[in-house]
Each structure stands twice: as structure tokens, then as C-alpha cells.
Amino acid sequence: MKRILAILLVLCMLLCGCGSDEEEVTEATQSEATEESSKVKVKEEKKVESKAEESSIVEEKEVFRHPLTGEVLEEPWKGVAAASTINNAPDALPQYGISQADVFYEIEVEGGITRMLAVFTDMEEVGSIGPVRSARSYFNNITAAYNIPLFHCGGSTYGANGYYDSANVLPEWRHVNEMEYPQYFFRDSDRYNYQGYAWEHTLFTTGEEMAAALTDKGYDVREVYDFGLSFAEKPEFNGESATEVEIIFEGGKTYSLTYNAGTGRYEGAEYGGEHIDGATGEVMSFRNVLALYTAQYHGEGGLSFYDLIGSGNGHFACDGKIIPIKWSRSDIYEPFVYTLEDGTPLTLGVGNSYIAIISDVRTVEYN
């Protein structure tokens, strides 16, 4: 009897041991399955995250803009830029090539008249440009803000010698003077011989000659320009209505701008008539209008000087509205910075700009 019980006990123990092994195998199998499932899930999550990241990259694709007009580009703009003085005496009109300037300045010189400065990029396609006139210190100052060469014909004692104000000379004056490099300019003989223009109103250059001069003088460095300007197709700002804007210079000369709602641009007029580009016959028009107020003082011979480093007030007009702004500039080779009165960076409309530098005892009139 005892032998039978012992045998039964051994059999029971063997059966229990087998059951335990089967459970361990089952648990191990379940654990491996769980781990595999977890791995698959992690891979799927990574795929989802990867797709989300790719989607995010597409949505956040960087937008490249032209540094002076804000036009959208496929890649960063790497071109060359230069500026030319433009004679604006009544007897010198019409001017040529000016409608293709990206930025167009007007500043009062001596005698109560104004002179203009046209800033061009990729100027090879521009035809005749001018009439070209002599330089002044403030033209040297403004072109230094862009770090671009100035095309001119002689100048005042200060303007022709690289001064950027009444006391300081540019460390590196980048310029092309017709008196030194006449090969990049030409005289319009028809103007002088048949049309009754004075000699000083007959000097021109061309976009092609400007580009050639930049290459010959080593000024054609193609770099990524960044002047710190912000642009939008439709700038948002709380301005007053301004369909008519009149710039009044210290000597009384005016420049009038009328907003054309059909084109979204301000059309220029001076001397009692439309401001015309003689090369195309079109009226000068601008997306942005800026008036920058600063101290204007006079030296020998009535020469004007302007404080263009520091800060001041101004006005900005775009899309039929106008708002007060502030401008600042920290150093001679630094660009102008524009903000709203509360310090918010100013956003310009995509397109070209007219900029008037005027005495801070003057202002603009608008309605």
C-alpha cells in the first residue's frame, strides 16, 4: 500500500512540473508578443511623427524677398546695386530710367531746388538714366547706408571728396565720377544741339554702362543684401485717410502724390504737372511714400547739410493711408530703421518707395 502511495505521489509531482513549464513557455511567448507589438507601435508612432515633421517643414518653408521691394523670390537675392544722382531742375526734365528705380529719394539742394537719387538693382536692363548731376555729401551718406556705389558728375567741395557731412569723410568711398571715368557716361547731343537744353542737363549713363563700371572697379560683389526692411502684400496699420499727400521742402518746392485706388499706388507730380519718365512716358508711381524729418543746416555757398545718423520723426503712406513713424540709424554704414511710434517695426508694402528727406521745421500735408 505504501509503495502504491509513493508511486502516486511521484506521478503527481511530475505532472505539476510539466504544467509549470508550459505556463512559463506561455508567459514567455506572450511577453515576446507584447514586446514585438510595442516595437511595431513605436515604429508606427515614429512614422506618424516623421510625417508630421515633414508636413511642418513644408508649411514653414522660408520665404525669400527682394531686399528693397519685398518681391517674393525663389532663393535669396544675390545681385548688385548702385545709385545715380538725378538732375531735377525744371529745365532738365524729363528724366530717363527713373521708373525702374527700386528706391527714389528727393532732397533739397541749394537754391531751393531739389535733386534726386535713384537706387537700382540688376540695372542691366535699364536703358538711359539721367540727367546725371553732381554729388552732395548727403548722397554719399545715403549710399553708404546701402553700401553701394554712387554715379555722379563732380560735386560740391564736400560731395566730390567723399564727405558724408560737413566734417567727416567716408572711410571707403565707392563711387564712379564722370570726370574720372567718362567712358561710362554720354552726352545727349540732340538735347544740346537741337532741343535747347543747357550743357549741365545733357549727361546720362545707362544700366549697361553702370553694370560694366561696377565690374571694372570691383564693385560687382554679389552678396545677400539685408537692409532690415519688412514687407507685406497688404500692410496692416491704423492710419488716417491720405489720398492726397504733399511733400513740402524748406525752400518751398513741393512734390505731390495722388493715390490711385485702381493700381494701389501713389502717382507723382511736380512743377504743376505729372512726373514723367521720358523713356517710357509713364507717370512715376510708388507703393510706399516716406517723409523723413531731420535737422537741415547750411554752409558756405548755401550748401545744405542733413543729420542722417541718429533718429527722427517721419510719415509713412501706403494703400491710401498715412501714419506717423520714427526713423533711426546707428552708424554711417548702417541702414535706416523704421518703426511705428510705439517702436513696432514698420511693414512696407511690396513694391518701390519714394523717400523725401526734409527739414524738421516742415511736414507733409494730406487729406
What is the meaning of each model-derived region?
Residues 2, 38-45, 50, 186, ...:
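Short, intrinsically disordered low-complexity segments
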Residues 12, 22-23, 27, 212-216:
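Polar/charged alpha-helical tracts
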Residues 22-70:
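N-terminal, intrinsically disordered, polar/charged segments of Gram-positive cell-envelope systems
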